[in-house]
Design a protein with these regions (language model features):
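Amphipathic terminal alpha-helices
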Residues: 1-9, 303-335
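N-terminal Rossmann NAD(P)H-binding glycine-rich loop of SDR-like oxidoreductase domains
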Residues: 20-40
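NAD(P)H-binding glycine-rich loop region in Rossmannoid oxidoreductase-like domains
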Residues: 64-105, 109, 113, 131-133
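Conserved Rossmann-fold NAD(P)-dependent oxidoreductase catalytic core, especially the SDR/UDP-sugar
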Residues: 109-149, 169
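Flexible, glycine-rich beta-alpha linker
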Residues: 131-132, 174-192
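Substrate-positioning beta->alpha
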Residues: 186-192, 206-228, 234-235
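Mid/C-terminal beta-alpha module of Rossmann-like enzyme folds, strongest
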Residues: 227-288, 317-335
C-alpha cells in the first residue's frame, strides 16, 4: 500500500483557506501529483501514507497514517480536495484479502474522513481492471466484469465513493480509471520493458498485436486537472491515450528512439511460459520474469478514453514524445 511520511513528519497545517490532501502520496502517481500541487502554489498539500516517500517533495506536509483506519487521523484547517490514490495494486504480489482490506476498507475510511472534515470534492483513482480482460474495446459505459481481486476491490471502492457523492448535492467526485501509467519512478511494466531492451533483447510471447492502453504520468495529471474543472458533479473517465497502441508499437517506439541496437523475437507462448517458470527467481533482480506478467503481455487492455475524446482533451500520437520526456527526466535510464 502506498501512503506516507518521512520519519519526522512536518507539523505544518493548512491555513483557513483550505488545501488538498493526498492519500497514498508516497507512491508513483502521488509523488508526481504532489510536485504538481506544490508548483501550482496555494495552501501546503498534505500527504498521508504508511510508507516514507522515496523522493521527498519540498513544501509537502508528510503525515503517517493507515487508510484502513483513519478514525484517529485529523487535519487542522479546511481540506479543499481529497485525492484518494492509496491502494494495494501490484499483481502478482499480494494475498487476495489484502486488496480488499486496503482498497475497500480504505475507500470507506477516506469517505468517512471526508464527512467528518466536510470535504466536498474527492478525486479517486480506480483502475481499468474493473472491466476485466477482453479483446473488445471498452469505454466508460461498458459493463464492469472484473476477474481479479484487485479489479473487484476497485469496483467496490468506486461504489463507496459514489454513495458518498449521492449523500449531498454540494459534493463533487472525479473517478479516473487509469490504464498502464508510465514515467519517472514507475518501476512497473514500462520500466521492465526498458530494462530488457537496454539489455539488448525483447521477446514477444506468442503475439505482437496485443493492445495495451497506456498514459504518461504527467498526461494523466493533466487529464485529472481537466476533469476537476468540468461543471459536472460526477466525472468518470478512462485515463489513457486514444491510439489503441499495440505491444509492438510501444516496443518499436522505445527501440527506434532509445534502444536501436536491441533485437526483438517472437517465441511461442508455451515456450516463454516454461522459460518464465524456470527464470522466475530473476524477478527479484527487477526484470519481472514471472508467468503472470508474461500473460499480461498477451491479454489486451483495449480501452478508449471516451469522456476525454468527446471534450477534445485527448491527443493522438503522443507515445514517442512521452518516452522522450521520460528519457530526458531520467538521463536516459528510464527509471
Amino acid at each position: 500500500m502506498t501512503a506516507a511520511a518521512p520519519s519526522q513528519p512536518s507539523q505544518a497545517a493548512p491555513d483557513a483557506a483550505g488545501g488538498p490532501i493526498v492519500f497514498g502520496g508516497s507512491g508513483f502517481i502521488g509523488t508526481h501529483l504532489l510536485r504538481r500541487l506544490v508548483a501550482s502554489g496555494g495552501t501546503q498539500p498534505i500527504s498521508v501514507d504508511l510508507r516514507d516517500p522515496k523522493n521527498v517533495v519540498p513544501g509537502v506536509d508528510y503525515r503517517r497514517a493507515d487508510v484502513r483506519n483513519l478514525r484517529d487521523f485529523a487535519a487542522r484547517g479546511r481540506i479543499s480536495t481529497i485525492y484518494n490514490l492509496a491502494a494495494v495494486h501490484t499483481t502478482p504480489g499480494h494475498p487476495d484479502h489484502e486488496y480488499y482490506e486496503t482498497n475497500v476498507l480504505g475507500a470507506t475510511e477516506v469517505t468517512a474522513f471526508a464527512r467528518r472534515m466536510a470535504v466536498i470534492e474527492i478525486v479517486f483513482t480506480s483502475s481499468i481492471s474493473v472491466y476485466g480482460p477482453s479483446e473488445e474495446t471498452k469505454s466508460e459505459s461498458s459493463p464492469l466484469a472484473p476477474v481479479s481481486p484487485y479489479g473487484r476491490s476497485k469496483m467496490l471502492a468506486e461504489s463507496i465513493h459514489r454513495a458518498w457523492l449521492d449523500e449531498s448535492a454540494d459534493r463533487r467526485l472525479v473517478v479516473v480509471r487509469p490504464a498502464v501509467i508510465f514515467g519517472p519512478g514507475e518501476g512497473g511494466n514500462f520500466t521492465r520493458m526498458a530494462k530488457l531492451l537496454k539489455a539488448g533483447m525483447f521477446v514477444y510471447p506468442g503475439r505482437r498485436d496485443t493492445i495495451k492502453a497506456c498514459f504518461y504520468v504527467e498526461d494523466l495529471l493533466d487529464a485529472i486537472m481537466f476533469a476537476r474543472q468540468a461543471p459536472d458533479r460526477f466525472v468518470l473517465f478512462n485515463g489513457c491515450y486514444p491510439d489503441r497502441y499495440t505491444l509492438e508499437q510501444i516496443v518499436e517506439a522505445f527501440r527506434t528512439r532509445h534502444f536501436p541496437k536491441a533485437r526483438t523475437f517472437e517465441i511461442p507462448l508455451g515456450v516463454v511460459m516454461a522459460g518464465a517458470q524456470v527464470l522466475r527467481p530473476m524477478s527479484l533482480m527487477g526484470l519481472g520474469i514471472h508467468p503472470e506478467r508474461v500473460m499480461k503481455l498477451v491479454r489486451s487492455t483495449d480501452i478508449a478514453p471516451g469522456w476525454l475524446e468527446t471534450r477534445n482533451a485527448s491527443t493522438r500520437g503522443k507515445i514517442a514524445s512521452a518516452l522522450d520526456r521520460w528519457a530526458a527526466s531520467s538521463n536516459g535510464s528510464f527509471t
